[in-house]
Swiss-Prot record:
Species per Swiss-Prot/TrEMBL record: Pseudomonas paraeruginosa (strain DSM 24068 / PA7) (Pseudomonas aeruginosa (strain PA7))
Stretches assigned to the Exonuclease domain: 32-206
Family per record: Belongs to the RNase T family.
Residues annotated as binding Mg(2+) 2: D35, E37, H193, D198
UniProt-recorded name of the protein: Ribonuclease T
GN (gene name): rnt
Role played: Trims short 3' overhangs of a variety of RNA species, leaving a one or two nucleotide 3' overhang. Responsible for the end-turnover of tRNA: specifically removes the terminal AMP residue from uncharged tRNA (tRNA-C-C-A). Also appears to be involved in tRNA biosynthesis.
GO CC list: cytosol
Domain of life: Bacteria
InterPro entries: Exonuclease_RNaseT/DNA_pol3, RNase_T, RNaseH-like_sf, RNaseH_sf
Keyword tags: Exonuclease, Hydrolase, Magnesium, Metal-binding, Nuclease, tRNA processing
CDD domains: RNaseT
Manner of cofactor binding, per the entry note: Binds two Mg(2+) per subunit. The active form of the enzyme binds two Mg(2+) ions in its active site. The first Mg(2+) forms only one salt bridge with the protein.
Length: 224
């Protein structure tokens, strides 16, 4: 991904005048959906193998929609543990000639740059991670940030929106595939456990739940 895709950096200054509706919706936080595929369950010792992030936009009526997805395959950090069972579960083949993996720092730098652009466009001050069992994804993200020494992390360090919880409330389902099906979405189990696919499905699920709540009168913009 070329830096030409991003025309300017967010300097932390919010625009003057009326705030964008997205900034009002979540107290200045921009939802960004993240999924990681890993070499195990321990964020301190196990490899980060894939990461995807989908930014969320808002239309003129205040409804959310998945906007742009960033996706990278990651080279395991030096000394990383990789459990064979994890590779079997995800189907990731580390030696595949077309894997085209990059270092953690490059992936995070480019994802964060795109998120900062989205923050500025939406008048938001910080990103908040959305994930299915979000503490897992946030834990691996924070561990990778610490390993690489990246200073400009746009995400809140511990707050998140968990779609497993939201889907349990909305549909009585906590498994991603079953929650998507309950929401009337298509879900291909053959594509599951790819960070890109799971992120985009989680983003669709999150937007659907939030939009359904709005339709029921659960959140009204100041202009509604």
């Amino acid at each position: 991904m070329s830096e030409d895709n991003f025309d300017e950096e967010f300097d932390g200054t919010l625009p003057s005048g009326p705030r964008h509706p997205m900034a009002r919706r979540f107290r200045g936080y921009l939802p960004v959906v993240v999924d990681v595929e890993t070499g195990g369950f321990n964020s301190a010792t196990d490899a980060l193998l894939e990461i995807a992030a989908t930014t969320v936009g808002m239309d003129e009526k205040g409804f959310l929609f998945p906007e742009h997805t960033y996706f990278f395959r990651i080279e395991p950090f030096e000394g990383a543990n990789i459990e064979p069972a994890a590779l079997e579960f995800t189907g990731i083949k580390l030696d595949h000639p077309l894997r085209m993996a990059v270092q953690e720092e490059q992936a995070l730098t480019e994802i964060f740059r795109g998120i900062r652009k989205a923050l500025k466009a939406n008048g938001c001050k910080r990103a908040i991670l959305v994930g299915h069992n979000s503490s897992f994804d946030l834990g691996f993200l924070n561990a990778a940030v610490a390993r690489t020494g990246i200073k400009r992390n746009p995400f809140h360090p511990f707050s998140s929106f968990d779609t497993a919880t939201l889907a349990g409330l909305a549909y009585g389902q906590t498994v991603l595939a079953k929650a998507c099906q309950a929401a009337g979405m298509e879900f291909d189990n053959r594509e599951a456990h790819s960070a890109r696919y799971d992120t985009e499905k989680t983003a669709e699920l999150f937007c659907g739940i939030v939009n359904r709540w709005k339709e029921m009168g659960g959140w009204m913009d100041d202009d509604d």
